[in-house]
Amino acid sequence: GVSLDQIENLLDSLLDLGITFIDTADCYTRSEELIGRYLGDRSGEFVIATKCGCISGGDGEEEYSRAVIERSIDRSLKRMGLECLDLVFLHTCSAEVLRAGEAADALMRARDAGKVRYTGYSGDDADALQAISMGVFDAIQVTFNILNQTALDEVLPAAQCAGIGVVAKRPIANARLLPPDSPQFYGGPYWDPVRSLLTDEGAWDDPLECSLRFTLSHPVITSAIIGTANALHARENAKRARAEALSPKLLDALHKLRPED
């Protein structure tokens, strides 16, 4: 498992790099506990985002019920030693759950009680569109990367029209661009054309950099999150994120490669 020393080294490195946004979740139990042990009186140096409502392992209760969400938020506050969470996302509940209203209402109640500063939804496709259409969330967290551009046509434009923040998850395509991974693991038939194009453009030397730059090139993306407990990987990804933007020509070519629905 990950040690407190690793987390301290990682979060110290993030601050040195000017990175202050931390994403975690109630169901990532150990993550929140280690973050809390690190933070102490330094919580003001970070923007802490977590996710609620998804039950890890199940406890006989209905996910996304008001009681589950309330307890989820309270656990996150306690683990991280915080009085207020900067941003809390509903954790990948369906459009049907969103329409029922109980989950969103529970999150808004926590905001009104001063436990949450900003509210959000984490999910993709029709579920994300439902969340945006409700007009109650401050941000969404969606999958968007060089191998999965499904958010490009509807979700990102809808978020832009709504004026809400967008956090991109899986911005380096779960590192599936690196050997020994291949199309059957991620990206399907889109994998080979992307690899061929990036090779032709001389961008295959560091496919992770190209993928991260692709994600960050979209003007609606507020932030991109990459899971790691390794300070060296964090520094490498920070360097990738600060590289030159992809050319409009390459971006257009990558957009045109995406599969038709």
What are these regions (language model features)?
Residues 1-2, 12, 16, 58-154, ...:
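Glycine/proline-rich, positively charged
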Residues 22, 35, 48, 76, ...:
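Conserved, mostly hydrophobic/aromatic
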Residues 23-25, 49-51, 88-91, 120-122, ...:
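A cross-family glycoside hydrolase active-site/sugar-binding cleft signature
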Residues 33-51, 105-114:
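Alpha-helix-loop-beta-strand connector modules within alpha/beta enzyme cores
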Residues 36-47, 77-81, 132-135, 161:
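Acidic (Asp/Glu)-rich catalytic clusters
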Residues 45-48, 137-145, 244-251:
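Short hydrophobic/aromatic-enriched beta-strand-loop microsegments
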